[in-house]
Amino acid sequence: MQIYLANPRGFCAGVDRAIAIVNEALARFEPPIYVRHEVVHNKFVVSDLANRGAVFVEELHEVPDGSIVIFSAHGVSKAVEDEAERRDLTVFDATCPLVTKVHIEVAKFAREKMDAVLIGHQGHPEVEGTMGRFSAQYGGEIHLVENEADVEKLEVSDPDRLAFVTQTTLSMDDTAVVIDALRKKFPNIQGPRKDDICYATQNRQDAVKDLAQRCEVVLVVGSPNSSNSNRLRELAERMNCKAYLIDNAGEMKKEWFAGVGAVGVTAGASAPEILIQEVLNQLQQWGGDLPDELKGIEENVTFSLPKELRIPVKEVGL
């Protein structure tokens, strides 16, 4: 059985930065360090950080006054940010800079008294944070749509003063369909100057398409609550591959590969390489060949840590 390995795969710059922020905070300051929401959507990563003193909470009321809290890579609403300031919490913001870019766009549209449309999945923390960056005090409104049916039902106050943004981890193909529907219904709708789908999401989706053309089965290493990992699985399935989303090698079943000539392995943007290697090892134990790593786009994007975590502790004033 041939094994093909997607490239790029796994950690993106935003995830690297978010995990580094938690690690640096734990190294500089004594636990507990509170983290609002899972810093990234991966069970292995979250469990490892929790074992070293990170305390994961869903809401700020679970964080004692005066504590250190880290916002997850998915971003938070303005209301959450304001609450942290009121309660004298020391905040290290691990929001991915590409998500922050969308926050800035939404806030700008609000100030310009426009309505905004967010293409995204209801209930996802990134969507909640972005929706919460739109201030209705200027008279506009933000609307959430997931698909063409939502666009068909959408009503806005002024179709000529309308703009859209997207969640960063969506399927490019699905998003293009929704954008086309928006432009058809609202010909004067404005879009972002640059596509909101992040570079890592796009690169990993391109890589899984390459993988699916060569394989009968595709394994996506990632947690069930990872949006970008789910999109990779769906994309492989659309290309007539059997595709499985797995947290780790222990979730694989040998019967998945009975009679299979080629299997592909990729990983979502929040899955660490160690989990990918464990999957490859298990496949080889079941008779797979040495993995063939496919060529792909080389990623050299990096994001710096907050300045408070780059200077000596005594200068931070904590």
From Swiss-Prot:
Its EC number is 1.17.7.4. Signal peptide: none annotated. (2E)-4-hydroxy-3-methylbut-2-enyl diphosphate binds at residues 41, 74, 124, 168, 226-228, 270. Gene3D superfamilies: 3.40.50.11270, 4-hydroxy-3-methylbut-2-enyl diphosphate reductase, catalytic domain. Disulfide bonds: none annotated. Belongs to the IspH family. This is 4-hydroxy-3-methylbut-2-enyl diphosphate reductase. It comes from Psychrobacter sp. (strain PRwf-1). The lineage of its organism: Bacteria, Pseudomonadati, Pseudomonadota, Gammaproteobacteria, Moraxellales.
